[in-house]
Amino acid sequence: MKRFGTRSGAWLGAVGLAWAFAVASPSAWSAEELKAENVVDRLQIQDLITRYYNNFGRENPENFSDFYADDAELILGERHFKGKDGIMQAYGRGPPQADQPPRPPRPTRYSFIVTVSNPLIVVHGKTATAQLVYTEYVIEKQGDPLKVTTQGKEYGTFVKVDGHWRYKTRQIKGGTEPPEGWKE
């Protein structure tokens, strides 16, 4: 008998659990949302978001631009970064710009963690939207108290590229109001 690896088993378990929750509360879900394909798509998008946020604070993170479509846009407050090169610029990993001073080195911290909560993911075939709350936590040195440094909302749109979900737009915003023109 062939055994599934830990990752395969976890993935199948997550799909099964999501399906069980969906079936257990049918009044909260539309028929379209209950389709197995949509449940899997939502789980894949949630996995993409989780892996993206787990990159923060890691010594050797995955390339942030790999989470985005080629023509994607990252919006941080009033600053817009377009395409994969622009996104790499946003994270200080792109080629140096002639008109910009060099970025200071990242601060050394004992722990930097970003958590994600309340994800609302809506799939529309080959596109999707997600909104969520993120919270940044820092411990400067071992033994120091935990500090919440930032909390805000992310509004993202997604597209399927070669069978994989990628960010099309990712907007980080404070406050309670969604971005102008936002649609689930």
Regions found by a protein language model. Give the residues of each.
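Short beta-strand edge/turn micro-motifs at domain boundaries
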Residues: T127-Q131, Q151-W182
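Bacterial N-terminal signal peptides
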Residues: G13-A24
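A solvent-exposed, acidic/Ser-Thr-rich amphipathic alpha-helical stretch
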Residues: P61-Y134
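Short, low-complexity N-terminal intrinsically disordered segments enriched in polar/charged residues
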Residues: A28-R58, E62, D66-D70
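Bacterial N-terminal signal peptides that target proteins for export
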Residues: M1-V15
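Beta-strand elements of well-folded, non-transmembrane domains
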Residues: E136-E140, F158
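Short, surface-exposed coil-to-beta transition loops
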Residues: V114-V116, T149-E154
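Transmembrane beta-barrel outer-membrane domains
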Residues: L43, R109-F112, K147-T149
